[in-house]
From Swiss-Prot:
Signal peptide coordinates: 1-29
Annotated gene: atl
PTM info: Undergoes proteolytic processing to generate the two extracellular lytic enzymes, probably at the septal region on the cell surface.
Cellular location(s): Secreted
The protein, known as: Bifunctional autolysin
Region annotated Disordered, chain positions: 103-151, 173-219, 419-440
Molecular function terms, GO-annotated: amidase activity; mannosyl-glycoprotein endo-beta-N-acetylglucosaminidase activity; N-acetylmuramoyl-L-alanine amidase activity
Length: 1256
């Protein structure tokens, strides 16, 4: 069965490789139940509701009742009808000894449009079972015993299971010349819109190939099942299409319509059917979906093979077609399913111009098993279909041999099954088409246009070879055109329904009115429209496609959501008064008041597209390479300019057609420079300047600029003098997220980044005695879970403890009564407020209590102290916890009275202070009221000192201050919670440590040390015990591996796995803890520190700013990003990183312009340097910094944005143990954690964000 041009010729839509969908897909799909919400944007916003309803219907009734499905024939192929001449049957030679196979000899046949296999006549898309009454005579239990010995192929002898040297000569001699276009595949439509074409149409017949012109195929493995298939001349059924509209469509890594091979899967479900599998997949497509399913009776394609699917993990998804074999249970059904799979696989290979090449033994080729992908490529850990095939006494090698044979038959290299071997051609029976196709060359190309069929026409053609067309009533309607075909002097268009995509057929060029069309784009704009204006179901619609008319009196509001250009006219789709449809923009009036352009209108505009102009407040620097300055946006070409690499003000932006322009002017004067194209500038948003009166210190040598964000061409001078100088600022402006100040220093004026300024140290003041009391606790009702620092005593009579605030019934809380616990979280639910109690070690949450059942006080920050005290005669004893009850006493008051208490830390509880220390060789807490200090020590206030460290803000309920210890000038930290805070100064006032530094928005502020943390650790409950998850891992078919002897891998046992997975143990290790580091969270490591680390790292040296920008822009941990780049570039020394150009498809390393690739993106193994540079050139990475920032988007989407965002999750996947795991080595996460920890040590930083799973 051959694929048909109607469906399978790729449209080859051009993709912008920078951030293209080749990596945007859910890279781990089919291996884990990750959230796929990042792909929801593939749904057309105007059709979400409709497609959702359609999806429900499709799932409820998949691929059924479609016996009237249309069949579209390949325009390039005329199919012969097989005759029943019994003389000289070209049956395939029987079992050939595997020793004959020469794995180094490969048949290099090219794709051809010849196909001698007929399509069976059928009135249903479900092909009838072939030979249903055949017994299992060919099957014996003996085969089960010697499956391995008989059918096992020596990987040293064979690479591709059907490529003997003997056949190579025969096939070359007999092979026809390959056509320029690969043969497409035949398809069926699930919901035909017209009945012009019948699914039961008799295939056309032509004179057969001479019977002696083709050799017999010699099987390369012994297979009773393959012999059974050949002997019974089993035919594959038609390919049914059951596409689902809401499945995403992403390109393969090489582009749309460019898969690199096919992967064999089995469903691993003995009790499911093909309909059941498809229905399940549609309901769970966010986790996985494949291209097709095959069983003994049907081949159902569920997703277009021109686009990737989510079936084989991160590495394989962008490369391969994925097809599932549905389990069957008897000999004949299994044989039919193997025949069907082999036919479908051979069809795909033929169509896409690929040759069979098994990847099973070396990881290179076009035919893969899921196991081979797991073994050689990774990104998945499945091992199918080997187990299922073995259960039927079959093997992959036998299936590959069948695929190879099918391919050679389709390519006209070997004789089809059942054909006669004499040279007498078969006689065609009642051909409906000429006995021989046109000798004219056929060319087919993708098209994106629209057409209306004229009332007088030649009809619709099933293929472009048809002598006559079939009459049609689909005239004077607008259809989408998806392909153009030229055969000889005739040109045809393939027309389809605009909204559903259902194919109608081919029409001659002279029978239509054709217009070019651009792809629709989403818009959000309102217009006014007159009553009575007609809406249409399609753009450029006719009177037969009216969707309704605008009702009401007076102008109505038309809300447009989509726009498409047909020829030079614009059509918009939208809604008005409850009716939706398309209307020409000529009937609409923009409700927004247009802003006049600042330049004269041209006398002869070059386009009819509407010009939109809007005010803008930004700044831009013109790139060294640009299209020049434009006097008006209508100008065809710009004028060369020397005003490059300078910062200008941007006052307006304009859009005309597909181009966007900025109007740039001199920053300090009203002088207009001209219009520049968007791609020719580096643009940043800017806020309006504001006047300030502030004084800073600035270091000598700091450069001043004539404009904010100025370049080296706009320097106004440098700060003179020795020692810090005083900079008096009078103006401030924010550019993007950076603050620039204009001021004067030593008689020079100019702009400088706030990062180069420091606030002068405040004069010392006398400070009051520190207060030990903490404000009394008051109940608040947070709407979300809040992190708090409090302490609580559980009342004897309480309503119980809850695992969640949503639990209606609490469990008995008697064992917690009359005890003190730490409170870490607080949440309101309904009219009640609950708090989360933790045990005395702070680490283990116990459950939620209603605050009505507690006595709660605020808990201060623990402060280190070194002091000896004498315990008063009357005291409350030594307790396990501050403010502990009698049930938590370690030593009674009598046991510690008059003793010496050595305190090491203290904490405030409400108005009391508790000290922690040692007495009588026991440690615990004592109320400060029960202690007497030998002498009172008056606290002192330290001067502010330099202190460089990046903390994490941990208290969203806290405040940041303009000056420390101020009760008035303070602002909420809620917006900055869990964000980094880069500290530059430290000061202690009244016993409280304050830090001065930069918030994530660039603002400088003071924050209490109690509101900061060196690291932010979050614990997530898995809902399982450690024993449970370890048992799952240890019980996998492919066991976790361990090296007990260096270089020798063995299966890890249960105890090995449990030890490796123990998160409590790992979290205590300072290095191994880094396997919990969040790789999707930037840490704001300073550029200086990054540059220090990158010193001597080749072209990556001094690229700290680029890594910092990339981390912030795409949400990636800087250290992880840097480690990735160092690994890929050999510490920045590879030629790929140093840069080159590709000219005439050759790498040029000494070119003036070089393109860089620092992450090895698209550097495929066959030619990594050329391919990697080609990708970089297409992406425009002509500097190392561009390669870092641009490549980071790829890295983020491909690796750390797929849900498993820590090394531990990558290795063990605690959310779904045993599935989608990156490695089998139980030490993999430990090794990589130590590497990343080592990088942090070299940079002089520590990890900030950790996510630790917890087991019950």
């Amino acid at each position: 069965m051959a694929k048909k041009f109607n469906y399978k010729l790729p449209s080859m839509v051009a993709l912008t490789l920078v951030g293209s969908a080749v990596t945007a897909h859910q890279v781990q799909a089919a291996e884990t139940t990750q959230d796929q919400t990042t792909n929801k944007n593939v749904l057309d916003s105007n059709k979400v509701k409709a497609t959702t309803e359609q999806a429900k219907a499709e799932v409820k009734n998949p691929t059924q009742n479609i016996s009237g499905t249309q069949v579209y024939q390949d325009p390039a192929i005329v199919q012969p009808k097989t005759a029943n001449n019994k003389t000289g049957n070209a049956q395939v030679s029987q079992k050939v000894d595997t020793a004959q196979v020469n794995g180094d000899t490969r048949a290099n046949q090219s794709a051809t449009t010849n196909n001698t296999q007929p399509v069976a006549k059928s009135t249903s898309t479900t092909a009838p079972k072939t030979n249903t009454n055949v017994t299992n005579a060919g099957y014996s239990l003996v085969d089960d015993e010697d499956d391995n010995s008989e059918n096992q192929i020596n990987p040293e002898l064979i690479k591709s299971a059907a490529k003997p040297a003997a056949l190579e000569t025969q096939y070359k001699a007999a092979a026809p010349k390959a056509a320029t276009t690969s043969a497409p595949k035949a398809k069926t439509e699930a919901t035909p819109k017209v009945t012009t074409f019948s699914a039961s149409a008799q295939p056309r017949s032509v004179a057969a190939t001479p019977k002696t012109s083709l050799p017999k195929y010699k099987p390369q493995v012994n297979s009773s099942i393959n012999d059974y298939i050949r002997k019974n001349n089993l035919k594959a059924p038609k390919i049914e299409e059951d596409y689902t509209s809401y499945f995403p469509k992403y390109a393969y890594r090489n582009g749309v319509g460019r898969p690199e091979g096919i992967v064999v899967h089995d469903t691993a479900n003995d009790r499911s059917t093909i309909n059941g599998e498809i229905s399940y997949m549609k309901n769970n497509y966010q986790n996985a979906f494949v291209h097709a399913f095959v069983d003994g009776d049907r081949i159902i394609e569920t997703a277009p093979t021109d686009y990737l699917s989510w079936g084989v993990g991160a590495v394989g998804n962008p490369r391969f077609i994925n097809v599932e074999i549905v389990h069957t249970h008897d000999y004949a059904s299994f044989a039919r399913s193997m025949n069907n799979y082999a036919d479908y696989a051979a069809t795909q290979l033929q169509y896409y111009g690929l040759k069979p090449d098994s990847a099973e033994y070396d990881g290179n080729g076009t035919v893969w098993t899921h196991y081979a992908v797991s073994k050689y490529l990774g990104g998945t850990d499945h091992a199918d279909p080997h187990g299922y095939l073995r259960s039927h006494n079959y093997s992959y090698d036998q299936l590959y041999d069948l695929i190879n044979e099918k391919y050679l038959i389709k390519m006209g290299k070997v004789a089809p099954w059942g054909t006669q071997s004499t040279t007498t051609p078969t006689t065609p029976s009642k051909p409906t088409t000429p006995s021989k196709p046109s000798t004219g060359k056929l060319t087919v190309a993708a098209n994106n246009g629209v057409a209306q069929i004229k009332p007088t026409n030649s009809g619709l053609y099933t293929t472009v070879y048809d002598k006559t067309g079939k009459a049609t009533n689909e005239v004077q309607k607008t259809f989408a055109v998806s392909k153009t075909a030229t055969l000889g002097n005739q040109k045809f268009y393939l027309v389809q329904d605009y909204n559903s995509g259902n194919k109608f057929g081919w029409v001659k060029e002279g029978d239509v009115v054709y217009n070019t069309a651009k792809s629709p784009v989403n818009v959000n704009q309102s217009y006014s429209i007159k009553p009575g204006t007609k809406l249409y179901t399609v753009p450029w619609g006719t009177s037969k496609q009216v969707a309704g008319s605008v009702s009401g009196s007076g102008n109505q509001t038309f809300k447009a959501s989509k726009q498409q250009q047909i020829d030079k006219s614009i059509y918009l789709y939208g809604s008005v008064n409850g009716k939706s449809g398309w209307v020409s923009k000529a009937y609409l009036v923009d409700t927004a008041k247009p802003t006049p352009t600042p330049t004269p209108k041209p006398s002869t505009p070059t386009t009819n597209n509407k010009l939109t102009v809007s005010s803008l407040n930004g700044v831009a620097q013109i790139n060294a390479k640009n299209n020049g300055l434009f006097t008006t946006v209508y100008d065809k070409t710009g004028k060369p300019t020397k005003e490059v690499q300078k910062t200008f003000a941007v006052t307006k932006e304009a859009s005309l057609g597909g181009n966007k322009f900025y109007l740039v002017k001199d920053y300090n004067s009203p002088t207009l420079i001209g219009w520049v194209k968007q791609g020719d500038v580096i643009y940043n948003n800017a806020k309006s300047p504001v006047n300030v009166m502030q004084t800073y210190t600035v270091k000598p040598g700091t450069k001043l600029y004539s404009v904010p964000w100025g370049t080296y061409k706009q320097e106004a001078g440098a700060v003179s003098g020795t020692g810090n100088q005083t900079f008096k600022a009078t103006k401030q402006q924010q550019i993007d997220k950076s603050i620039y100040l204009f001021g004067t220093v030593n008689g020079k004026s100019g702009w400088v980044s706030k990062a180069y300024l420091a606030v002068p140290a405040a004069p010392k003041k006398a400070v009051a005695q520190p207060k030990t009391a903490v404000k009394a606790y008051t109940v608040t009702k947070p709407q979300t879970t809040q992190t708090v620092s409090k302490i609580a005593q559980v009342k004897p009579n309480n309503t119980g403890i809850r695992a969640s605030v949503y639990e209606k019934t609490a469990k008995n809380g008697a064992k917690y009564a009359d005890r003190t616990f730490y409170v870490t979280k607080e949440r309101a639910h309904g009219n009640e407020t609950y708090v989360l109690l933790n045990n005395t070690s702070h680490n283990i949450p116990l459950g939620w209590f209603n605050v009505k059942d507690l006595n709660v006080q605020n808990l201060g920050k623990e402060v280190k102290t070194t002091q000896k005290y004498t315990v008063n005669k009357s005291n409350n004893g030594l307790s396990m916890v501050p403010w502990g009850t009698k049930n938590q006493v370690i030593l009674t008051g009598n046991n510690i009275a008059q003793g010496t208490f050595n305190a090491t830390k203290q904490v405030s509880v409400g108005k009391d202070v508790y000290l922690y220390g040692t007495i009588n060789n026991r440690t615990g807490w004592v109320n400060a009221k029960d202690l007497t200090a030998p002498t009172a020590v008056k606290p002192t206030t330290s001067a502010a000192k330099d202190y460089n460290y990046t903390y994490v803000i941990k208290n969203g309920n806290g405040y940041y201050y303009v000056t420390p210890n101020s009760d008035t000038a303070k602002y909420s930290l809620k917006a900055f919670n869990e964000q980094p805070f880069a500290v530059v100064k430290e000061q202690v006032i009244n016993g409280q440590t304050w830090y001065y530094g930069k918030l994530s928005n660039g603002k400088l502020a003071w924050i209490k040390s109690t509101d900061l943390a060196k690291e932010l650790i979050k614990y997530n409950q898995t809902g399982m015990t450690l024993n449970q998850v370890a048992q799952i891992q240890a019980g996998l078919q492919y066991k976790p591996q361990v090296q007990r002897v260096p270089g020798k891998w063995t299966d890890a046992n249960f105890n090995d796995v449990k030890h490796a997975m123990d998160t409590k143990r790992l979290a205590q290790d300072p290095a191994l803890k880094y396997q919990f580091l969040r790789l999707d969270q930037p840490q704001n490591i300073s550029i200086d520190k990054i540059n220090q680390f990158l010193k001597g790292k080749g072209v990556l040296e001094n690229q700290g700013a680029a890594f910092n920008k990339a981390a912030q822009m795409y949400g990636i941990n800087e250290v992880y990003l840097i480690s990735h780049a160092l690994l890929e570039t050999g510490n920045g020394t590879s030629q790929l990183a140093k840069g080159a150009d590709v000219v005439n498809n050759k790498v040029v390393t000494n070119s003036n312009t070089k393109y860089h690739n620092v992450f090895g993106i698209a550097a495929y193994d066959n030619d990594p340097l050329r391919e990697g540079i080609k990708y970089a050139k297409q992406a425009g990475w002509d500097t190392v910094s561009k390669a870092i920032v641009g490549g980071a988007k790829f890295i983020g989407n491909s690796y750390v944005k797929a849900g498993q965002n820590t090394l531990y999750k990558m290795r063990w996947n605690p959310a779904h143990p045993g599935t989608h795991q990156y490695a089998t080595d139980i030490d993999w996460a430990n090794i990589n954690a130590k590497i990343i920890k080592g990088y942090y040590d070299k940079i002089g930083e520590v990890g900030k964000y950790f996510d630790i799973p917890q087991y019950k």
